[in-house]
């Protein structure tokens, strides 16, 4: 076997994904400790975790950016290279999770043994389904009071619709948790506290656990029989003839096909269970060789599909999945190489910009420290320096064999705040700092209000913007004043309107002329984009070359609705007919006619204001539930359901307009004496009632007269 192929076979690109407090970063830290990359274990609760490298992360104890780390692990005599991506679990940062999942081959879904499947676990699980990422489950915090491995396994099945397949069961729970039973080898593993869990012993299963272990082994074999014919045959004839090797092959096969999720458990904080988790990563998660060939399109012919296999001899194909600013080396671009390889000092083609870029240096990252590399090969994750123009989602490839990979889609920001520098000298620094941060984060936008000159920054939630302001202060030394949060409203129309628009201009010499008849109406329910444009012009009444200009005019005009200049969403425009002048008509005339048609038709089409609605989940003690629901009702919330958690707390699910959620965390703390927690994420846009629309439009001096 060629050395390169061997290298691919022993590479794992994995992410650790979970709810905010399930212990992702702690687990990552233990992996770095046991694989020999760190000599002191970092703890998230004392702010020394290696993976949480931004100052705000260390203060807040949560992970914001996905730090990518390369480490090694010896398993069955082979040295495995593990590229580990630590992903955030807070809903304001789901975009970071999406980015990571796009470039991973497999994932470790971490669950808290006490909290089980929490709201964010569901979100992340759905994201991993979307990208077809095989996963193994790790039930962490087995040492905590209320830990229940079997209940978490049940929740995976019932809440997530997963097919959990325990390959370990715990020995003890809460303070008596001391090891696991390996159901494949039918042995007990005990970790030694005196070596901080670095050493463990493999022993016979304690007699009092033997029957339970056999029962769970049988359940494991039954799950494997469903996805492997060879096991099924032996399982029904004589299960005792199934060999350890056959079980390992079947688990790997079922995991890669996403038919099962092998389940392991441990307590990362107490240094138990991490080595067996690493073994499971090497044994069951895919190598780049196990992933299908990546598909892209030909930049010169977007209908032509190109595939690239994960081979070193294929032309270079890589995806930029994150841009970060490093204080020492400048702009760092993280990328995943799907085919071929990148050499330091070489040129690559960016198919979005159409430009060749020279990569001056290459690194592999250990959290935020760089290890210089000469080459980053197929199936690997690395970072490069030297890019002049690079964005998240760009394809980097060989200029002689261009390819464009599917770009990444990011949600639109839903909340904005106005910012201004405290002093005049901060003015330039503010602009530069915001531009750099917007480059790093595709869900963060910066706009300048042309009328007021105000700078408005927008993001995915209050925490997201807090952290941006914090980074401006720390990294760019800019102090700024901030306004109160503003909601990013949208506009929509409710009725169809048909209209003829003629644009004519005569000023001596060649004039301007365009004549269009359009029907404007709300887009079809199933339509995903912003503008659904249909051309029904017959007989060349409008020449083909002018039709894209009509579409372009509507696209431009939709950015500013007639009520208050908010963008329009989901519009259907049908170009029915029109006429042109052989001398005076040009592309610009048709574009202007479309812009005017939009403005005139919108005012007659029942324009309405749309507001972002958030999906909220509040976990509260029973005795505070009445107050919590009363408060949500006051905030125009719609309670959709209530559940009881394992610990007896009540879980309230509601849809609440974003405009009513500002300061909610503080209010919730007050009404429940700090005993409730909440999480929310964007759900959809919905029409605002006329009384509230008038209030909003009065604030922004919009067209209140158009609201019925």
UniProtKB/Swiss-Prot annotation:
Keywords: Cytoplasm, Elongation factor, GTP-binding, Nucleotide-binding, Protein biosynthesis. It is found in: Cytoplasm. GO terms for molecular function: GTP binding; GTPase activity; translation elongation factor activity. GO terms for cellular component: cytoplasm. Its main location: cytoplasm. The keyword Disulfide bond does not apply. PROSITE patterns: G_TR_1, G_TR_2. One of its GO terms (biological process) is ribosome disassembly. Pfam families: EFG_C, EFG_III, EFG_IV, GTP_EFTU, GTP_EFTU_D2. Residues 9-289 form the tr-type G domain. InterPro entries: EFG_II, EFG_III, EFG_III/V, EFG_IV, EFG_V, EFG_V-like, EFTu-like_2, G_TR_CS. GTP binds at residues 18-25, 86-90, 140-143. The keyword Nucleus does not apply. SUPFAM superfamilies: EF-G C-terminal domain-like (SSF54980), P-loop containing nucleoside triphosphate hydrolases (SSF52540), Ribosomal protein S5 domain 2-like (SSF54211), Translation proteins (SSF50447). Catalyzes the GTP-dependent ribosomal translocation step during translation elongation. During this step, the ribosome changes from the pre-translocational (PRE) to the post-translocational (POST) state as the newly formed A-site-bound peptidyl-tRNA and P-site-bound deacylated tRNA move to the P and E sites, respectively. Catalyzes the coordinated movement of the two tRNA molecules, the mRNA and conformational changes in the ribosome. PANTHER family: RIBOSOME-RELEASING FACTOR 2, MITOCHONDRIAL, TRANSLATION ELONGATION FACTOR G-RELATED. Belongs to the TRAFAC class translation factor GTPase superfamily. Classic translation factor GTPase family. EF-G/EF-2 subfamily. This is Elongation factor G. It comes from Parabacteroides distasonis (strain ATCC 8503 / DSM 20701 / CIP 104284 / JCM 5825 / NCTC 11152). The gene is fusA.
């Amino acid at each position: 076997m060629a050395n390169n192929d061997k290298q691919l076979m022993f590479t794992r690109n994995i992410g650790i994904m979970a709810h905010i407090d399930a212990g992702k970063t702690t687990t990552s830290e233990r992996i770095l400790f046991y694989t020999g990359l760190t000599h002191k274990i970092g703890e998230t609760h004392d702010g020394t975790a290696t993976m949480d490298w931004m100052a705000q992360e260390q203060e807040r104890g949560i992970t914001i950016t996905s730090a990518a780390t390369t480490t090694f692990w010896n398993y069955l005599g082979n040295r495995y290279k593990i590229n580990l991506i630590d992903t955030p679990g807070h809903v304001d940062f789901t975009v970071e999770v999406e980015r990571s999942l796009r470039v991973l081959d497999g994932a470790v879904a971490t669950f808290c043994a006490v909290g089980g499947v929490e709201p964010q676990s569901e979100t992340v699980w759905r994201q991993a389904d979307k990208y077809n990422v095989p996963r193994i489950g790790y039930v962490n915090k087995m040492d905590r009071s209320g830990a229940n491995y079997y209940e978490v396994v049940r929740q995976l099945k019932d809440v997530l619709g997963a097919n959990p397949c325990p390959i370990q069961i715990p020995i003890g729970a809460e303070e008596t948790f001391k090891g696991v039973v390996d159901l494949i080898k039918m042995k007990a593993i005990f970790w030694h506290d005196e070596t901080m869990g670095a050493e463990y012993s493999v022993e016979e299963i304690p007699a009092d656990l033997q029957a339970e272990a056999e029962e769970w082994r049988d359940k494991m074999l039954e799950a494997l029989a469903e996805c492997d014919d060879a096991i099924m045959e032996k399982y029904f004839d004589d299960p005792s003839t199934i060999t350890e090797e056959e079980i390992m092959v079947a688990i790997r096969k079922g995991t890669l096909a996403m038919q099962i999720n092998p389940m392991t458990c441990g307590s990362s904080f107490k240094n138990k269970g991490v080595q067996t988790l690493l073994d499971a990563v090497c044994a069951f998660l895919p190598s780049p060789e196990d992933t299908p060939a990546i598909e892209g399109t030909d930049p010169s012919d977007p209908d032509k599909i190109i595939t690239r296999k994960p081979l070193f001899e294929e032309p270079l194909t890589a995806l930029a999945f994150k841009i970060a600013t490093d204080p020492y080396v400048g702009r760092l671009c993280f990328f995943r190489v799907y085919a071929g390889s990148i050499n330091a000092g070489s040129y690559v083609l960016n198919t979005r910009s159409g430009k060749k870029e020279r990569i001056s240096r290459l690194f592999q990252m250990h959290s935020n420290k760089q290890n210089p590399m000469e080459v980053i090969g197929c199936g690997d994750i690395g970072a490069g320096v030297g890019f002049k123009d690079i964005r998240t989602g760009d394809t980097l490839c060989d200029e002689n064999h261009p390819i464009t990979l599917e770009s990444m889609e990011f949600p639109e920001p839903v909340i904005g705040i106005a910012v201004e520098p405290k002093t005049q000298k901060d003015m330039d620094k503010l602009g530069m700092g915001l531009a750099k941060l917007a480059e790093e984060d595709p869900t963060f936008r910066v706009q300048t209000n042309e009328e007021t000159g105000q700078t408005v920054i927008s993001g995915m939630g209050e925490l997201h913007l807090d952290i941006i302001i914090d980074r401006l202060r720390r990294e760019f030394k800019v102090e700024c004043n901030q306004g109160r949060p503003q909601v990013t409203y949208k506009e929509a129309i409710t009725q169809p309107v048909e209209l003829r628009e003629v644009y004519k201009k005569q000023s001596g010499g060649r004039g301007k002329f365009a004549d269009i008849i359009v029907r404007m109406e709300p887009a079809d329910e199933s339509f995903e984009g912003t503008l659904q444009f249909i051309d029904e012009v017959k007989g060349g009444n409008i020449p083909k070359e002018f039709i894209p200009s009509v579409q372009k005019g509507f696209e431009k005009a939709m950015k500013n609705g007639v009520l208050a200049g908010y963008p329009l969403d989901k519009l259907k425009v049908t170009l029915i007919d029109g006429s042109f002048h052989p001398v005076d008509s040009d592309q610009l005339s048709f574009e202007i006619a479309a812009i005017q048609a939009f403005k005139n038709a919108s005012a007659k089409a029942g324009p309405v204001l749309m507001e972002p609605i958030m999906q909220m989940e509040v976990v509260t003690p029973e005795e505070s539930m009445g107050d919590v629901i009363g408060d949500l009702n006051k905030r125009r919330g719609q309670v959709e359901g209530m559940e009881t958690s394992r610990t007896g707390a009540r879980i309230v699910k509601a849809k609440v307009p974003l405009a009513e959620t500002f300061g909610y965390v503080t209010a919730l703390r007050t009404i429940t004496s700090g005993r409730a927690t909440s999480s929310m994420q964007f759900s959809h846009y919905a029409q605002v009632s006329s009384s509230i629309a008038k209030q909003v439009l009065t604030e922004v001096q919009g067209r209140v007269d158009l609201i019925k």
